[in-house]
């Protein structure tokens, strides 16, 4: 039996074993159409807090990940609940590192309530390799039938 485990261990590439398993908490949000129609029925989400953490120079596999955490609250009075919505991100100013901005519309699976936290990650590199990052992002709510709400702006910035 030990021989079987040893053989299986040897067949797994070392690179796959060393890959960082941490990922964002976001998942794709299904919409019935790829077209978006701006709607005044959807308010902008309220940005409560933005946390921005650069990658580290440690020896652990995930140390070079950067983290951007955006905590939002859905305004009262909307005819939509937060769990009925997805969110789309776009860069208004600056250049986002590859992998930071989610492709398409995203949601946090299983979420309930008026508050939500989006965890975005990217390969930030070691501190000596990092570029300064100053971004202005927009985040908008999107319904399953393609209605898109007003944007909220998120400022992200910091020297490496």
Model-inferred region functions:
Residues 147-158:
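Extracellular fibronectin type III
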Residues 98-114, 155:
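Solvent-exposed serine/threonine-rich low-complexity stretches and specific carbohydrate-binding patches
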Residues 11-15:
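N-terminal signal peptide c-region/cleavage motif recognized by signal peptidases
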Residues 19-75, 160:
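Short, compositionally biased P/S/T/A/G/V-rich stretches that sit at domain boundaries
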Residues 75-102:
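Solvent-exposed loop/turn segments flanking beta-strands in beta-repeat/beta-sandwich domains
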Residues 113-129:
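Signal that preferentially marks extracellular ectodomain short beta-strand elements
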